[in-house]
A protein has these predicted regions:
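Feature captures the catalytic cores and cofactor-binding loops of soluble hydro-lyases/lyases
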Residues: 8-9, 89-169
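Intrinsically disordered, low-complexity regions enriched in acidic/Ser/Thr/Pro/Gln residues
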Residues: 1-77, 82-83
């Protein structure tokens, strides 16, 4: 799911982990699944984005204790639909993807509030989830911004409760 090779859990027939190898049997041939272009997020006000500036701090005790975990939350209209934390930023996105699939969350109008840097690998995962806006405390890479621009993903970084930087798709 996280690499966008299998559309849903239902397409996985079996999963075997043995001797350090993983074998996944699927109902369909593995291939990249195109993400539908559906984007119902519309225009987002700056105040709404800033309102999420302190969200991750309010959700994670682990971050306060260690300052060693990444976090991500999918939000819609002030409601947290999914939250994940992990020591790896990619793992956070994989966990969120699993929650989206498990709970059947429609992500066409959600924002991802994120703690990590935003390189092209993060944008690829965000695109695979079908999310159209990522707002992160950290900064993006040039390649991440290039890919986000191609995918139509709005990138907001340096997120704080009183400010942020908008990098792509200002029309949103």
């Amino acid at each position: 799911l996280a690499e966008n090779l299998v559309p849903t859990y239902a397409d996985i027939e079996s999963l075997v982990v043995e001797d350090g190898k993983v074998l996944v049997k699927t109902t369909a041939e593995a291939h990249e699944i195109p993400t539908p272009p559906a984007d119902r997020l519309g225009t987002v006000k700056a105040d709404e984005i800033c309102g999420y500036g302190g969200l991750l701090d309010s959700l994670s005790a682990a971050h306060h204790a260690s300052h060693g975990v990444h976090e991500g939350a999918l939000v819609r209209n002030g409601e947290v639909l999914a939250y994940a934390e992990d020591i790896g930023r990619h793992n956070v996105l994989d966990r969120l993807r699993g929650i989206v699939e498990d709970k059947k969350i429609d992500v066409s109008d959600v924002m991802l509030i994120f703690s990590g840097r935003v390189p092209q690998s993060v944008i690829s995962k965000v695109h695979g989830m079908g999310v159209h806006l990522i707002a992160s405390r950290a900064l993006p890479s040039a390649l991440g911004l290039k890919l986000a621009n191609e995918y139509g993903i709005t990138v907001v970084c340096g997120l704080r409760s009183d400010s942020f930087r908008l990098y792509t798709h200002p029309e949103r």
